[in-house]
Amino acid sequence: MDMQVQRPITSGSRQAPDPYDQYLESRGLYRKHTARDASSLFRVIAEQMYDTQMLHYEIRLECVRFMTLKRRIFEKEIPGDFDSYMQDMSKPKTYGTMTELRAMSCLYRRNVILYEPYNMGTSVVFNRRYAENFRVFFNNENHFDSVYDVEYIERAAICQSIAFKLLYQKLFKLPDVSFAVEIMLHPHTFNWDRFNVEFDDKGYMVRIHCTDGRVFKLDLPGDTNCILENYKLCNFHSTNGNQSINARKGGRLEIKNQEERKASGSSGHEPNDLLPMCPNRLESCVRQLLDDGISPFPYKVAKSMDPYMYRNIEFDCWNDMRKEAKLYNVYINDYNFKVGAKCKVELPNETEMYTCHVQNISKDKNYCHVFVERIGKEIVVPYESLHPLPPDEYRPWSLPFRYHRQMPRLPLPKYAGKANKSSKWKKNKLFEMDQYFEHSKCDLMPYMPVDNCYQGVHIQDDEQRDHNDPEQNDQNPTTEQRDREEPQAQKQHQRTKASRVQPQNSSSSQNQEVSGSAAPPPTQYMNYVPMIPSRPGHLPPPWPASPMAIAEEFPFPISGTPHPPPTEGCVYMPFGGYGPPPPGAVALSGPHPFMPLPSPPLNVTGIGEPRRSLHPNGEDLPVDMVTLRYFYNMGVDLHWRMSHHTPPDELGMFGYHQQNNTDQQAGRTVVIGATEDNLTAVESTPPPSPEVANATEQSPLEKSAYAKRNLNSVKVRGKRPEQLQDIKDSLGPAAFLPTPTPSPSSNGSQFSFYTTPSPHHHLITPPRLLQPPPPPPIFYHKAGPPQLGGAAQGQTPYAWGMPAPVVSPYEVINNYNMDPSAQPQQQQPATLQPAPLSVQSQPAAVYAATRHH
């Protein structure tokens, strides 16, 4: 006999602890949940009267009969018609109330102890001579449960375990049932390092002694049956031939296998050895399945066989039936069909019922229109001839897509071979685009056009290049490299011509006529084009923050006459995703590695677009020295700029040699070598306010390239800026960059100062160089060139909160000569007088309001 440890009684069917249950259990009571349907009251009375809930409908009918006989007592407590009420109460879908509880108390001669949430019970005495009571738990949802003492539940758990063990051990004859229950429900209580076992003469394990006092008796193969469907897969039972049930199972399986072999046409001489699922001959199949992590029977069955765990079998069965009915959407004991229901119809003079679909039902439910699948037409049948579908013929609908993510995923097959392994880099392996991409599906574009801007520029250039391709082919001798690339270049050439879009303005393509001997004009390589209209024949100057802004350092002028842009503004967006700042000159300190894309040399021999050199021996490089020298020099210059050093041969091209900062240097030498279109990044003018968009003449500051500084080293800047001298002059405040700008949220009481950047010769790491240029700052003044209109007076079209530019703070003193032709060491009066401005457009109107609060 098995010896087990003492444990407190627990509930095996409750999924989560209920606070009401915990309150009752702390006081020695146990709440047994009943099915949450309309018959909960009658289930409680049937269980407490007859120890089963299966008689709940009979209890309902007895209650209705008793209330009908005692009509004079219960009629006054029922609102409305008493007969209609009794007729509805006889139906299973009508909820019972306190009136029915009183009637059944009088019927069965018992008083009631009514429990409510957080209440120890209220005794309702109908007659003092009644010796027993109904213990009912009631909540506000019109639901009733049974309440028992904990001692009663302990005895019920023992009886339940005995009943299930008799079923599985004596009827099914499964081996080692008690041991399997302990392993499944209490695996943490086993200490396999300390235990004793006993063996018989044949080597079978017959008993296990645990250190905590538990003793488990193990079964022998002759007294049990195999848990597997085919006992031949279990060496524990297949070696014993005295099993009648297993022999019958094996005989049926053997006959079935022989029939399958005959049907398939095999000779029947195949080896009959099957891979055993339980290979150990001295260990039972149940223990071997447990060792493999397989449950020999459901956990609910194991809970029912545990004497210290009570399982609410009635509630579990009802819950399973409810889930099954909800899953398969079947009518269970209900003939209340709806339109669209799939059911069976009983036709006259037919021996079997046919599957049909309800199309229409009359209001009185006397007849209905159904579509019969067998005959393929719609007929009218009586409503009583409809019957629910049997469970084996019902096929549920497909689950919605939102439930698919909860279903198990199908495992993807693993690719065999070396493709599944992590590939290692080899230097002798080079990337060939032809091996991975098709030419017809791979188009390499230098930029991404938005709204087809400047379309005529590239279309005309392609057309001119197409006309000149045959002549270039005649002039250039054939080489091995051109012979290899000629077929691919022709395919690319044909595809480019086929996918070419016709220009919208055909007259623009006829303005230029190119002769056969003349070289085609270079393509205009541009990264950004401001969204402002420009006059014909003039390309808008780039802002200093753009990659084309360092004109002093990289003087690559665009050769040829630029093509006129369209009248409306347009943009070429680069692949980097950095949008252009608003038009206007924005300061940027020091040289940076961003540079414009220069035009290639015109005397390059070859066909089609240039390609990358991939061969290790360099056989795919151009044969002409001009192209090699051009790109080699470009790489050397890029290397110097990436390391943030100045190339030795370009020192004379700079407009300055030191950082232009008067706050840190007492004196400097200014080298004037810039023109009108090439402004340095340090001495550029901040963007103007939109209020001056209607001005007709630019400020003199825009026409001057350099501004000399005040070399007064005695001046000390305080916390707040000093009062400006000669405030009526428009040149001084317009170029006064370190002047703090008032914040719009502080009403002019707070100002933003700009910090001094690091010198240009400071070494910066390459990752920092690849960052995009900083956004433009916010300047709140009214002097400057014409700007876009459309903004309100006193507002700025740019968003507040943008970071300040990295500039060198400096001042331009009044009467300082801004003319580029002047000498850098001399101060001369200004030769160009500014145009008279209105009072509202003068800088004094901007700074006076915030400085004199």
Swiss-Prot record:
The keyword 4Fe-4S does not apply. One of its GO terms (cellular component) is cytoplasmic ribonucleoprotein granule. Changing C343Y: Fails to accumulate in the oocyte during oogenesis. Keywords: Amyloid, Cytoplasm, Hydrolase, Ubl conjugation pathway. The active site is at D37, S40 (nucleophile), H143. Residues 499-517, 783-794, 820-838 have a biased composition (Low complexity). It comes from the Eukaryota. Activated by protein aggregation, which is mediated by the LC domain and enhanced by RNA binding. Residues 747-758 have a biased composition (Polar residues). This is Deubiquitinase otu. The lineage of its organism: Eukaryota, Metazoa, Ecdysozoa, Arthropoda, Hexapoda.
